[in-house]
């Protein structure tokens, strides 16, 4: 849905022009995968600071396809959300305009394009976790490789292939084990993981409820959801600090090439990735900043951090479409799918 944020017109745009900076357009259009609540918070703060009115359209999994389909006649200025692999792909297709935010040099190389075509905004670790009322720390898996052991048959549940984090997780595991043991071994791993999985859920809340009710002991999910269910919903969950690391998805942002409001787009990227912009989202929505400087005022759990799994996202970007098709078509057992009522 198209949502407008803010209608505050003030004189700040004129001030920036007088100060020798580029004058901003009056409005901005954003395509995003983020929640409406989060987008509203960010856009209101941006409007407050710049006077630029923002409209956002929440597109979830269709984001990349929409940007791609409008390449000859862009309707939006900003693509906000989605993983590194997706941004690498669209950059190659010529969908983005490079920008140079003031914080770019502070951002680690893993979280940005070398030529400024896209930037990482939030780190989203995917972790394994278990119900500690059903399993002791000794019995629980220690690493991703343990999930395929015979002892865990029927004790694992996860999201289905509609979940973007699950898709990134499967692609990451195929890439990681291909690099480590060869591609045949990687597919053997994913096949055994499917065999050990009791159910796939099309809803995150249903999956967590199933773990809470003891239908299975082990699952995997983005870290902030696990923490939310542990702390706010009082579920008996224990997070596993995997030996190989957490599959860390980087949520990105980019300015769309030939967009109607390029100056406002560059200013929005400047705002979102800044220390203040990152802290706002960290404290309001538990999203871990990609910019290290923002961590000092972020929630405490973000500062301990989880070691990221060593992954080459350019390899994942090149192969993700084929890998996920193979997983969905040849491996995923559709009879294990559970849909929300």
Predicted stretch roles:
Residues 6-9:
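Bacterial signal peptide processing site
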Residues 18-89:
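Early extracytoplasmic/lumenal segment of secretory-pathway proteins
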């Amino acid at each position: 849905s198209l949502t407008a944020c803010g209608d505050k017109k003030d004189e700040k745009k004129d001030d920036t022009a007088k100060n020798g900076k580029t004058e901003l357009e009056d409005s901005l259009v954003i395509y995003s995968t983020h929640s409406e609540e989060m987008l509203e918070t960010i856009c209101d703060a941006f409007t407050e600071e710049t006077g630029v009115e923002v409209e956002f359209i929440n597109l979830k999994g269709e984001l990349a396809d929409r940007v791609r389909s409008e390449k000859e006649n862009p309707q939006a200025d900003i693509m906000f959300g989605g993983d590194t692999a997706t941004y690498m792909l669209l950059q190659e297709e010529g969908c983005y305009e490079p920008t140079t935010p003031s914080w770019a040099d502070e951002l680690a190389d893993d979280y940005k394009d070398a030529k400024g075509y896209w930037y990482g905004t939030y780190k989203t670790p995917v972790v394994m976790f278990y119900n500690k009322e059903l399993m002791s720390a000794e019995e629980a898996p220690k690493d991703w490789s343990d999930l395929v052991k015979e002892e865990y048959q029927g004790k694992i549940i996860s999201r289905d292939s509609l979940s973007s984090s699950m898709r990134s997780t499967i692609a990451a595991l195929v890439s990681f084990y291909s690099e480590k043991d060869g591609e045949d071994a990687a597919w053997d791993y994913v096949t055994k993981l499917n065999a050990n999985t009791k159910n796939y859920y099309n809803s995150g809340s249903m999956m967590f409820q199933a773990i809470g009710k003891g239908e299975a002991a082990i699952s995997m999910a983005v870290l902030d959801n696990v923490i939310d269910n542990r702390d706010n919903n009082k579920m008996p969950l224990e997070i596993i600090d995997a030996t190989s690391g957490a599959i860390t998805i980087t949520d990105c942002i980019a300015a769309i090439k030939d967009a109607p409001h390029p100056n406002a787009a560059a200013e929005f990227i400047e705002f979102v990735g800044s220390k203040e912009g990152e802290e706002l989202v960290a404290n309001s929505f538990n999203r871990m900043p990609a910019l290290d400087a923002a961590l000092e005022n972020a929630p405490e759990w973000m500062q301990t951090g989880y070691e990221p799994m060593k992954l080459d996202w350019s390899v994942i970007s090149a192969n993700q479409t084929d890998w996920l098709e193979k997983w969905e078509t040849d491996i995923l057992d559709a009879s294990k799918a559970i849909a929300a009522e």
